[in-house]
């Protein structure tokens, strides 16, 4: 950051992903392109069009403050959102700064790593035009389908039997009269009639029951097409680049779609030999149809998407009654189970985002004005970032979730405006064997956000959607339930930075930097702090004693240390808010205002902390870069450890203060890890080459202190000596069996009601009582190892690529299987007297819940290796193409998300954290003129 260095002179830990690697496969955003390409960078995916996953660089260091990295696009730090709005084909390179010696120059904003995005710029030469485009067809693949209608009916029979075996037959002994009770209780005559089809011949035949594939109703073949046209050219004094892009991503779930338009332009002008100026603009307009919305439902705990809503409906339910009317609540009164027929047209969540990001600079080279000042330059740069976001939600009264009550609408907007102004002085000079670089920086930035939201029920006309909120009477709360809110937030950051880069004889390297940051979000007297860093490098390959070792091309040792800060709390965390409300005065309501003290407000508020300061991380990094056998083997390895102090935590305080909690600088964590990047060329002949890249990372974090010193915070599952994110609860030891009768009796004597087929919790203290004293740390939510592996095979223009990624050594909570007998159920192996080796407990019909410990079986050890992409392309011979005016041409086909080579949980896609994923095939074209 803030300058350019030769790779051989870099002393910090960083990784670079170039445009060629980024474009090995077409992606919707740069997050997808980065996955598995850089050691120490863990990226989760999202299949919803227009939605990105999350990214972590070297794990978590903070407990409650943000762990998101800083994004810098063409020198401009982004204050809102990430890089999802940027066209990946406009990106020249992505540099990831990982250690404190690299990120400390960004001060407070670099605590969680820095991602530098450099977009493409014009190059001197003839005008070059390029087109890139692709079409992708995707289908949803479910690793955990719902039970068929027949299987579900049998399963419910078992649930009734297990709830009352005296009065109900076994599940494998069908009884017509009992079925009339089991399936009439739901209150859906059509569903009962469907069940009775199985009794049409007087004996039970489950194959005659209509099996409704609800999931198939809401899915479709998703079609994505993206196109980018770009041009570049110029001469020695002026270079320009432009790009226009279009993306349309239709989801595999009906109602989900994302459309994005991109425009990018840059100009660089050598106005005078001593003055250069330029700028770039990156604009985007995106429209996301988020899909099925649960906003405005009577319960906020409904399904997260329409596919989940469909899977919640038992398959013995049917969509229509005998008269062809849609059945709103298939299978009856089951909570939060509604039809999905045409719901994608009755539940709208439309989100629009406009973003314009600029980067403008002017640079003076004083050495060109006066020779004695050779190497001295001054650069001023200004980067504005504007983002406007609008969300419109409309749920028709005819939708299943509104149950014919009232139309619901919501309209919300967010406007973000930020800017960064940098004044930078650089001095670079070589004195014999000494190479010196000095950078001085003064930087100021400001962030402002305005937001507004309004919602109401009983919108009189569906055509209004969210565009006529004034059509409701806001004073009639009972009828319209109208609500509105507005808000504004802003913060500022001022910084001063100095850095020295020194190299002696191209062998011994030194980088020293210091940054002084002041953040407006912290308390007076604590706003400013200093963040130093230093790094050493030794290019062993340049030593005289290495000259005769021809197989070593590069060998460099690195050591770095530095301190970074984190002030990622809300803008007014150190201040008390003013609360507004209405009080009766005579016959009218009069507005009144009070501080946020709980004496005046009913809500729980935090006590203002006028001493809130910086969260600081000190990191040490030990690294080696190497290249052997003329580059056939190359890579880097880094070992790091860090300590984070003065954590920004919500701390419980005595209630005699009138408050329950406050933000404070308390607690410590530490972090240790290893990053490995290995590039191999196992085979290289005249016509054939096989290249392989492996990126692996190990990471472990640990809590050292909390708000109350060395005392655990059990309510938040924070434990001294353990990872920041763990699962804490009761362990299970499989299922109780008939042979455990004597052991069960000891527990049941203390009030438990264990039976054969139920979950067997582990009694840690051996007192035959399962309570809070039996809870333990079950596992870590974050992976210990993250892996990326890509292989490319080239033969005379034919190119085959395979990409894999994986995570290892962590735990997921799959939720277990409640098996209450009334909700839908995925296909599982459940306990019966004839299936005692089942994976899950026996079903027990209950409106209040079946087996109280069913969730314990949801905790699973997680590890996977996923085949992310297989591509086959052909690069046409450039000599033959010149005859028809084409400089380059590539055709390719790709398969996306083929499946897993290994997964410890067979019914989940552990990469996504869901039971379903999209598998697709892409056909693409790249052509240059």
Question: Where are the predicted features?
Answer:
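Short, small/polar-rich motifs associated with maturation and membrane association
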Residues: 1-264, 272, 276-278, 282-284, ...
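Outer-membrane beta-barrel transmembrane strands
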Residues: 220-236, 245-247, 340-391, 411-430, ...
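Flexible loop and strand-edge segments within Gram-negative outer membrane beta-barrel domains
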Residues: 140-142, 204-245, 249-256, 262-337, ...
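Surface-exposed loop/turn segments flanking beta-strands in extracellular/periplasmic regions
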Residues: 152-165, 184-209, 298-342, 395-409, ...
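Outer-membrane beta-barrel signature, preferentially recognizing the C-terminal barrel domain
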Residues: 345-347, 475-497, 586-634, 662-685, ...
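Small-side-chain secondary-structure face that scaffolds active or pore-lining regions
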Residues: 251-262, 268-270, 282-284, 288-296, ...
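Extracytoplasmic gating/loop element in the C-terminal half of outer-membrane beta-barrel translocons
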Residues: 202-203, 333-342, 477, 519, ...
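Short loop/turn motifs that connect adjacent beta-strands in outer-membrane beta-barrel proteins
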Residues: 122-127, 236-237, 274-277, 367-376, ...
């Amino acid at each position: 950051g803030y300058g350019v260095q030769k790779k051989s002179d870099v002393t910090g830990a960083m990784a670079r992903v170039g445009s060629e690697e980024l474009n090995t496969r077409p992606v919707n955003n740069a997050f997808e392109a980065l996955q598995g390409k850089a050691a120490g960078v863990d990226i989760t995916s999202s299949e919803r069009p227009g939605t990105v996953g999350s990214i972590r660089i070297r794990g978590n260091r903070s407990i409650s403050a943000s762990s998101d990295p800083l994004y810098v696009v063409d020198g401009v730090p982004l204050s809102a959102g990430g890089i999802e709005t940027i066209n990946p084909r406009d990106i020249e390179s992505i540099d990831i700064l990982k250690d404190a010696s690299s990120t400390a120059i960004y001060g407070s904003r670099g605590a969680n790593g820095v991602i530098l995005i450099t977009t493409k710029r014009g190059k001197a030469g003839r005008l070059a035009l390029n087109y890139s485009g692709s079409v992708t067809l995707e289908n949803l693949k479910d690793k955990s389908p719902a039970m068929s209608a027949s299987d579900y009916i049998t399963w419910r029979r078992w649930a009734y039997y297990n709830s009352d075996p005296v009065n109900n037959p076994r599940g494998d002994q069908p009884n017509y009269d009992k079925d009339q009770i089991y399936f009439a209780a739901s209150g859906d005559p059509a569903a009962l009639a469907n069940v009775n089809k199985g009794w049409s011949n007087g004996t039970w035949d489950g194959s005659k029951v209509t099996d409704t594939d609800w999931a198939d109703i809401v899915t479709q073949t998703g079609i994505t097409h993206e196109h980018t046209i770009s041009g570049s050219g110029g001469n020695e004094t002026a270079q320009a680049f432009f790009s226009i892009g279009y993306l349309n991503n239709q989801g595999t779930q009906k109602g989900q779609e994302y459309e994005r338009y991109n425009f990018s332009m840059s100009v660089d002008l050598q106005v005078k030999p001593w003055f250069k100026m330029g700028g770039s603009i990156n604009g985007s307009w995106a429209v996301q149809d988020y899909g099925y919305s649960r906003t405005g439902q009577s319960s906020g705990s409904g399904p997260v998407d329409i596919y989940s809503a469909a899977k919640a409906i038992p398959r013995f339910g049917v969509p229509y009654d005998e008269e062809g009317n849609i059945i709103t609540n298939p299978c009856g009164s089951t909570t939060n189970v509604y039809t999905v027929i045409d719901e994608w047209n009755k539940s709208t969540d439309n989100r629009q985002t406009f973003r314009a990001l600029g980067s403008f600079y002017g640079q003076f080279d004083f050495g060109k004005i006066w020779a004695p000042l050779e190497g001295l330059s001054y650069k001023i740069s200004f980067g504005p970032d504007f983002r406007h976001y609008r969300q419109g939600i409309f749920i028709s009264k005819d939708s299943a979730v509104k149950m014919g009550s009232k139309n619901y609408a919501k309209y919300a907007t967010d406007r973000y405006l930020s800017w960064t102004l940098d004044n930078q002085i650089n001095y670079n000079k070589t004195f014999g064997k000494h190479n010196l670089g000095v950078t001085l920086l003064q930087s100021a930035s400001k962030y402002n956000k305005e937001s507004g939201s309004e919602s109401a029920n009983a919108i009189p006309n569906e055509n209004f959607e969210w565009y006529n909120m004034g059509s409701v009477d806001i004073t009639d709360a009972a009828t319209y339930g109208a609500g509105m809110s507005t808000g504004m937030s802003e913060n500022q950051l001022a910084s001063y930075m100095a850095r020295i880069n020194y190299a002696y004889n191209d062998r011994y390297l030194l980088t020293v930097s210091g940054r002084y940051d002041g953040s407006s979000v912290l308390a007076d007297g604590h706003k400013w702090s200093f963040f130093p860093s230093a790094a050493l490098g030794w290019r062993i390959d340049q030593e005289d004693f290495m000259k005769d070792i021809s197989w070593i091309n590069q060998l460099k040792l690195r050591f770095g240390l530095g301190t970074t800060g984190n002030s990622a709390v809300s803008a007014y965390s150190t201040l008390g808010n003013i609360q507004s409300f209405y009080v009766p005065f005579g016959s009218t309501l009069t507005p009144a205002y009070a501080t946020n003290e709980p004496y005046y407000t009913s809500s729980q508020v935090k006590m203002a902390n006028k001493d809130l300061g910086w969260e600081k991380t000190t990191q040490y990094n030990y690294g080696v870069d190497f290249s052997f056998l003329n580059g056939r083997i190359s890579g880097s390895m880094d070992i790091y450890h860090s300590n984070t102090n003065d954590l920004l935590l919500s701390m419980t305080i005595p209630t005699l203060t009138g408050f329950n909690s406050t933000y404070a600088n308390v607690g410590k964590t530490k972090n240790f890890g290893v990053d490995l990047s290995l590039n191999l060329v196992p085979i290289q002949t005249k016509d054939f080459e096989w290249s392989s890249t492996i990126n692996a990372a190990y990471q472990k974090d640990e809590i050292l202190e909390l708000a109350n010193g060395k005392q655990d915070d059990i309510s938040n599952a924070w434990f001294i000596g353990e990872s920041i994110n763990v699962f804490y609860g009761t362990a299970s030891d499989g299922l109780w069996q008939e042979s455990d009768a004597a052991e069960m009796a000891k527990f049941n004597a203390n009030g438990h009601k264990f039976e054969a087929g139920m979950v067997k919790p582990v009694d840690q203290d051996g007192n035959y009582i399962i309570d809070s004293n039996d809870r333990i740390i079950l596992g870590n939510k974050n992976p210990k190892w993250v892996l990326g592996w890509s292989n490319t095979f080239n033969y005379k223009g034919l190119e085959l690529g395979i990409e894999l990624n994986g995570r290892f050594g962590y735990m997921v909570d799959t939720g277990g299987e409640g098996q209450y007998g009334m909700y839908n159920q995925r296909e599982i192996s459940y306990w019966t007297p004839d299936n005692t080796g089942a994976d899950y407990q026996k079903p027990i019909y209950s409106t209040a819940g079946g087996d109280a410990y069913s969730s314990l079986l949801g905790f699973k050890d997680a590890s996977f290796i996923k085949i992310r992409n297989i591509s086959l392309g052909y690069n046409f011979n450039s000599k033959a193409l010149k005859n028809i005016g084409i400089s380059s041409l590539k055709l390719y086909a790709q398969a996306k998300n083929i499946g897993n080579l290994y997964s410890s949980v067979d019914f989940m896609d552990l990469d996504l954290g869901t039971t379903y994923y999209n598998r697709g095939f892409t056909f693409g074209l790249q052509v240059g003129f």
